[in-house]
Amino acid sequence: MNERLNLADLKAKTPADLLAMAEEWEIENAPSMRKGEMMFSILKEHAEEGYEVGGDGVLEVLQDGFGFLRSPEANYLPGPDDIYVSPEILRQFSLRTGDTIEGVIVAPRENERYFSLTRVTKINFDDPERARHKVHFDNLTPLYPDERLKMEVDDPTMKDRSARIIDLVAPIGKGQRGLIVAPPRTGKTVLLQNIAHSIATNHPECYLIVLLIDERPEEVTDMQRSVKGEVVSSTFDEPATRHVAVAEMVIEKAKRLVEHKRDVVILLDSITRLGRAFNTVVPSSGKVLTGGVDANALQRPKRFFGAARNIEEGGSLTIIATALIDTGSRMDEVIFEEFKGTGNSEIVLDRKVADKRVFPAMDILKSGTRKEDLLVDKSDLQKTYVLRRILNPMGTTDAIEFLISKLRQTKSNAEFFDSMNT
């Protein structure tokens, strides 16, 4: 009974490895099975042999009173390898949707379809006993961000200077609600990848989730390979209901982790597409705004974006979302206008700069962070003010080209500030 097999280990294997394992355990017609069914059969065989089987996932509580553990690999959507959680366990540990749970599972009996959870070993990467006494997310006190997320990476081989420019122009803190305002083809996805890379390198204590809504499948693969964090996606060929379900699960998971005083960062691409998805899903209220947006449609994406906050009691939820503009669609403009004043940090990208192939194509004069004095120390703050005074008379393109040329001459922002003889 001491042998243990984990569901997560099986999910990490390639289909070819799983097939070899299935054949080793003499599972019938394994080659014709899909990956989920194959894992199901392998686990069932192991459970019958007396192995202890471990499973994990993110809880979704259904209206009927029971729940299922959904897996991040399936983007938290229902699948054959979900794990059933009984109402007794939900009550015992007072579990809610979004809780990340690890435990011991048993194989389904004759007329059952799912594995079921028998023992909980961890809740939100914490001891189950500690999880009982946590404060609900809505009752925590929100504050302005006061702890800096450093974007600059000490890597001399990096040619891309967008992380350093963000540190200078629009510093990001833990609990920031940031908006990247971007026309099409201005390099917003690459900018998000750079931010993700910086956070993974400089702040390993942060739990990083990249949420891609309505994006191209090849971009999803690119993100998964380049980002050291959790990448959750719903591509453009999926229905809007699926976009919504994925986004709701991600934000619930993040809230539960913040209740455990964790620092969570969500990078969302893009909030405009999420707004469109909610607009499709929400039942019509009869009041329609310009561009075909229903009056009630943006309530839920606002609640998603508004969840970002720095918590006084410990923990923070940072959301950095991209908003699309100049797409030629009135709906996108309306959605952007609704979100315009809600963030406390804005990075604005400019099409004219991108057309000159200058990257990052940032409009420095329009980008900035509110209450940046809480994030940046006094001497650096004075120097950024001086820098802005120098850049202000220049045009958008000249300003960014001037800044990039100056940054090329120095290895770090600290060195750059030293070279400014003020």
From Swiss-Prot:
Q: Which SUPFAM superfamilies match?
A: Nucleic acid-binding proteins (SSF50249), P-loop containing nucleoside triphosphate hydrolases (SSF52540), Rho N-terminal domain-like (SSF68912)
One short Pfam family name for this protein? Answer: ATP-synt_ab
**Biological process (GO), any one:** DNA-templated transcription termination
What's one GO-annotated cellular component?
cytosol
What is the originating organism of this protein?
Cereibacter sphaeroides (strain ATCC 17023 / DSM 158 / JCM 6121 / CCUG 31486 / LMG 2827 / NBRC 12203 / NCIMB 8253 / ATH 2.4.1.) (Rhodobacter sphaeroides)
InterPro entries in the record, alphabetically? Answer: AAA+_ATPase (IPR003593), ATPase_F1/V1/A1_a/bsu_nucl-bd (IPR000194), CSD (IPR011129), NA-bd_OB-fold (IPR012340), P-loop_NTPase (IPR027417), Rho-like_N (IPR011112), Rho_factor_ATP-bd (IPR041703), Rho_N_sf (IPR036269)
Q: Which domain of life is it from?
A: Bacteria
Cite the GO molecular-function annotations of the record.
Answer: ATP binding; ATP hydrolysis activity; ATP-dependent activity, acting on RNA; helicase activity; RNA binding
Signal sequence span is: none
Which gene holds the coding sequence for this protein?
A: rho
Query: What is the name of the protein in this document?
Result: Transcription termination factor Rho
Q: What does this protein do?
A: Facilitates transcription termination by a mechanism that involves Rho binding to the nascent RNA, activation of Rho's RNA-dependent ATPase activity, and release of the mRNA from the DNA template.
List keywords of the entry alphabetically.
Answer: ATP-binding, Helicase, Hydrolase, Nucleotide-binding, RNA-binding, Transcription, Transcription regulation, Transcription termination
Q: Kindly report, in one word, the top-level EC class recorded for this enzyme.
A: hydrolase
